[in-house]
From Swiss-Prot:
A Gene Ontology term for the protein's cellular component: cytoplasm
UniProt protein name: ATP-dependent Clp protease proteolytic subunit 1
GO biological process, one term: protein quality control for misfolded or incompletely synthesized proteins
Similarity remark: Belongs to the peptidase S14 family.
Record's keyword annotation contains Cytoplasm: yes
Catalytic residues identified in the record: 107, 132
One GO molecular-function entry: ATP-dependent peptidase activity
CDD domains: S14_ClpP_2
Localization annotation: Cytoplasm
Catalytic activity reported: Hydrolysis of proteins to small peptides in the presence of ATP and magnesium. alpha-casein is the usual test substrate. In the absence of ATP, only oligopeptides shorter than five residues are hydrolyzed (such as succinyl-Leu-Tyr-|-NHMec, and Leu-Tyr-Leu-|-Tyr-Trp, in which cleavage of the -Tyr-|-Leu- and -Tyr-|-Trp bonds also occurs)
Function: Cleaves peptides in various proteins in a process that requires ATP hydrolysis. Has a chymotrypsin-like activity. Plays a major role in the degradation of misfolded proteins.
Record InterPro entries: ClpP, ClpP/crotonase-like_dom_sf, ClpP/TepA, ClpP_His_AS, ClpP_Ser_AS
């Protein structure tokens, strides 16, 4: 298996052999996608996956800053700081970033889906998008002054998440706050109406049959 990209697999990742004029090499689906400028976020958003995604974004930009990068997303979400690290890198690189939701983009992953280049944010017909307010992981304990600090941090994260979603959806921050007070689950069409994506993709097979 090619050691260059090691996703957080929960099963044995299939590998295959490729023959070329340069010889024989062993590859896997993630490396093959990377060669096509495709990043696949298929795990929880945490420090490890964020570092992997950021590294791939920066490498692909250095290889060709004028070609689009595609990010496929099927993720339950994750930590806020990891989310913002990926988000900032997406905004930092010069290449346009297409985002495509396969399966689900929940919580932090929904923000990344919305953060793609305008006009290039997509989802498959049965994809699910979930947005809600951020939270701190674990039980909050400590002195009262520490609890105040934690409460202020939660409010800061919530405000930042609301303004970020507002920037990319066209909604105002007050609407985002109201909608994310509890879990808000959207179908692909509803996510399009909300401004999180621009297009609900058709199945390629059906498109070919009707062409």
């Amino acid at each position: 298996m090619n050691p260059q990209i090691q996703p957080q697999a929960r099963y044995i990742l299939p590998s295959f052999i490729e023959h070329s004029s340069f010889g024989i090499k062993e590859s896997n689906p993630y490396n093959k996608l990377f060669e096509e400028r495709i990043i696949f976020l298929g795990v929880q958003v945490d420090d490890a996956s964020a570092n992997d995604i950021m590294a791939q974004l920066l490498v692909l930009e250095s290889l060709d800053p004028d070609r689009d990068i595609t990010m496929y997303i099927n993720s339950p979400g994750g930590g806020f700081t990891s989310l913002m690290a990926i988000y900032d890198t997406m905004q930092y690189v010069r290449a346009d970033i297409q985002t495509v939701c396969l399966g689900q983009a929940a919580s932090a992953a929904a923000v990344l889906l919305a953060a793609g280049t305008p006009g290039k944010r997509m989802a498959l017909p049965n994809a699910r998008v979930l947005i809600h307010q951020p939270s701190l992981q674990g039980v909050i304990q400590g002195q009262f002054s520490d609890l105040e600090i934690q409460a202020a941090e939660i409010e800061r994260m919530r405000t930042l998440m609301e303004t970020t979603l507002a920037r990319h959806t066209g909604k105002d921050a007050a609407t985002i706050r109201k909608d994310t007070d509890r879990d808000k689950i959207l179908t692909a069409e509803e996510a399009k109406d909300y401004g999180i994506i621009d297009t609900v993709l058709e199945y390629r097979k059906l498109s070919a049959q009707t062409a």
